[in-house]
Amino acid sequence: MAISKAMRAALSILSYPEIDVKKSYLVEREVQKLLSHRLKNAALYHVWDHPVFSGVHSVPIRIFKPAGVPKSALLLFFHGGGWVTGTIDSYDGVCADMATATGCTVAAVDYRLAPEHRFPAAPEDCYAAAREVFRSAGSFGVEQENVVLIGDSAGGNL
């Protein structure tokens, strides 16, 4: 069955434009930077940055601890973004909301992004962060058995 000229034109209009991911990820990073918002109600949680060292570089981790919550679980969160976009800044609101909604401490990992950092940089950073969080769980106010690894999209893969 042939597609009519009118249908072909409609499909063309409704189709996604051709995107060169090798170029568009830089634009996506800038858009995320502009859209990332600081925390809505900082009285609901305590936030601090905690670097983890992996070889010769540090891996930033941002901790979101709900205020007034006794020892609970810690959600070690790896952000999404196709391994090329996303940061702990762009996920601030998500992590803060997650901490408030669950009553759990959330530790967001800012792993190195491709293509500037080739595989296996991202999984190595995530492993270093997980190792440090498990080793020093008590300093985050949790027991090791209450540390849960979670991720969004590419972060779930990591």
Map each language-model feature to its residues:
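Conserved catalytic-core motifs of eukaryotic protein kinase domains, centered on the activation segment
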Residues: 87-89, 117-119
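A glycine/proline-hinged amphipathic helix-loop "lid/cap" segment
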Residues: 1-63
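Short beta-strand element of the alpha/beta-hydrolase
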Residues: 71-81
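Short strand-loop-helix active-site module centered on a catalytic nucleophile
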Residues: 61, 76-78, 98, 119-158
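A generic structural signal for alpha->beta connector loops
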Residues: 44, 58, 103, 144-146
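Short amphipathic alpha-helix adjacent to the substrate-entry channel of hydrolases
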Residues: 88-109
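Short beta-to-alpha linker loops that shape the active-site pocket of alpha/beta-hydrolase fold enzymes
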Residues: 110-114
